[in-house]
Amino acid sequence: MSSRKRKATDTAGRHSRMDPNLSSDDSQNPGAVAAANREVLDAGREDIISSGTERQQARKEKQDLVQEFEEPPNKVLQENRERFSRIMTSSFSAMEVKIKDVLKTHCEERQKLCQDYSLQFTNLNRKLTSDAYKLKKHAETLSNMFMEQQKFIHESLTLQKNRMKEFKSLCEKYLEKLEVLRDSRGNSIAEELRRLIATLEIKLLMLHNQQKTAAPPQSLLDVLFS
């Protein structure tokens, strides 16, 4: 082989081993330069997308961690709300039952008192009617016996006077006992209400203290978000 042919073969081999992207003459290979630029842009875009995904993942993990710390206090507050509702419902129900019992008891006592005194009034009225009838009969029978009639009338008037006093006394006692019963009913209801309200205040205070004890410390959230 001549020296000229050997030189041409060596030159062709060197060109075939060279990287097109590393060519020094850009004007001779513009397609290779464009492909290299696209590879650089794609790599940068992938880095940006990867960085955004990592930030979203980190933000989600932080939110999950915050939710983990916030879930127990919310659960405790919900349970305390339900307990408070049950206590209020139970207290008002007990108060209503107590008031109904007191009113029922006083109503029964009042009815019994009215029945007792009504019976006494009826008996006394029957006696008064009977005495008036007897007085009339004796007055007609003893019309001719003035002295005896006068004596009997005097005795009858005295008896009527005493029984009218008894009737008046009975009325006064009835009104007095009715007034006492009315006052005692009001006092009993007021006392029962005060007692139930005091009990309710104690329960609410205990529930408030339990809520304060169950509340998480604020410093834990400060440490979490710091």
Swiss-Prot record:
Keyword Electron transport in record: no
PANTHER family: X-LINKED LYMPHOCYTE-REGULATED PROTEIN 3A-RELATED, XLR/SCP3/FAM9
Domain of life, per lineage: Eukaryota
GO BP annotations listed: positive regulation of dendritic spine morphogenesis; positive regulation of synapse assembly
Compositionally biased spans, kind Basic and acidic residues: 8-18, 39-48, 56-65
Gene symbol of the encoding locus: Xlr3b
Protein name: X-linked lymphocyte-regulated protein 3B
Oxidoreductase as UniProt keyword: no
Coiled-coil portions: 159-210
Keyword terms, alphabetized: Coiled coil
Membership in a protein family: Belongs to the XLR/SYCP3 family.
Positions with biased composition (Polar residues): 21-30
One family name in Pfam for this protein: Cor1
Region (Disordered) residue spans: 1-65
